[in-house]
Amino acid sequence: MEQVVIVDAIRTPMGRSKGGAFRNVRAEDLSAHLMRSLLARNPALEAAALDDIYWGCVQQTLEQGFNIARNAALLAEVPHSVPAVTVNRLCGSSMQALHDAARMIMTGDAQACLVGGVEHMGHVPMSHGVDFHPGLSRNVAKAAGMMGLTAEMLARMHGISREMQDAFAARSHARAWAATQSAAFKNEIIPTGGHDADGVLKQFNYDEVIRPETTVEALATLRPAFDPVNGTVTAGTSSALSDGAAAMLVMSESRAHELGLKPRARVRSMAVVGCDPSIMGYGPVPASKLALKKAGLSASDIGVFEMNEAFAAQILPCIKDLGLMEQIDEKINLNGGAIALGHPLGCSGARISTTLLNLMERKDVQFGLATMCIGLGQGIATVFERV
């Protein structure tokens, strides 16, 4: 079986969905920009030699509809002979795109693929056109389709207080801002055209979603967003709404060496699981455990983790049940997470994996794990190994 390697990984800055940098930039353009950039950064690989493009996107309608992967590839002037498919596993879409490409390479059906994902939540809101089947209520609580209420449920089940959530959210912003100030994101962010507050076209090379002024005291003043009477989850402890894209160049190790390209990491194992939709945010726990089992590793073998911060109330129970509460500041989301950077649904899996690869290199660790919860009760995880 072929070894699957990540040759390169990049992303756009994360733009605010409400009147942000990419308010006049379409999702296809964000995607095409990264496709062109990956190919330009790795000229040894001819675009025509790509076997496929796998691109995650959740709301596949309006500008994100009709197979955005193919639309973006055409905009990027990728040769018409290269196919492209849009992947949807909700929040885990672009990580699923990576898994799909990896399996093609493992079986010998592909040698080189572009993978990634995008979501423009300013142009195509998360709830646009959603119409749940009324019969679902026979098997699943109606509230299971409301992500904020599933986070409230997890917080109550695991004893996660409002104070713990506020502290974690403040940490996310502080760490993301520190990473920005220290240029820790420089190797992953590709400058991307957008418009400033005055409408002037400019190149953005930083995440505009981060709020460096965030404090625990300020967060404590916010009202509950989903359960106004008994709730603890606020807008400040939820992932921000943002627009962005991320992309990776994935190859067989043999093809990468043949072309003189240096792999950054191997895909050591992959896992996806289902869980109770009412606690959808718990999915990273069984997914991570399964991925670790497949890799023959334990949580203690992992040097750094990237865990998508859908909600502070959601990630803290996952950290607790993976036995990592005492290692948060040494191993988990060291450059902040989605609470500060936002969670553009189809982008986030590739985004956290890209950040993870850079952290693995900076911290000089052998193994890293990226994991995410998924709406309606799933979890997905990937273990990476430095080459």
From Swiss-Prot:
EC number per UniProt: 2.3.1.16
Reaction equation(s) it catalyzes: an acyl-CoA + acetyl-CoA = a 3-oxoacyl-CoA + CoA
Species per Swiss-Prot/TrEMBL record: Escherichia coli O9:H4 (strain HS)
Entry GO CC: cytoplasm
Domain of life from the UniProt record: Bacteria
Protein name (record): 3-ketoacyl-CoA thiolase
Annotated metabolic or biological route of this protein: Lipid metabolism; fatty acid beta-oxidation
BP GO annotations: fatty acid beta-oxidation; phenylacetate catabolic process
PANTHER family, per database record: 3-KETOACYL-COA THIOLASE FADA, 3-KETOACYL-COA THIOLASE, PEROXISOMAL
Family: Belongs to the thiolase-like superfamily. Thiolase family.
Keyword tags: Acyltransferase, Cytoplasm, Fatty acid metabolism, Lipid degradation, Lipid metabolism, Transferase
Subunit structure and binding partners: Heterotetramer of two alpha chains (FadB) and two beta chains (FadA).
Subcellular location per the Swiss-Prot or TrEMBL entry: Cytoplasm
Enzyme type, top EC level: transferase
Positions annotated as active site in the UniProt record: C91, H343, C373
Entries under InterPro entries matching the protein: FadA (IPR012805), Thiolase (IPR002155), Thiolase-like (IPR016039), Thiolase-like_sf_Thiolase (IPR050215), Thiolase_acyl_enz_int_AS (IPR020615), Thiolase_AS (IPR020610), Thiolase_C (IPR020617), Thiolase_CS (IPR020613)
Record PROSITE patterns: THIOLASE_1, THIOLASE_2, THIOLASE_3
GO molecular function, one term: acetyl-CoA C-acyltransferase activity
A Pfam family recorded for this sequence: Thiolase_N
Stored NCBIfam families: AcCoA-C-Actrans (TIGR01930), fadA (TIGR02445), PRK08947.1 (NF006510)
Function: Catalyzes the final step of fatty acid oxidation in which acetyl-CoA is released and the CoA ester of a fatty acid two carbons shorter is formed.
Annotated CDD domains: thiolase
Keyword Lyase applies: no
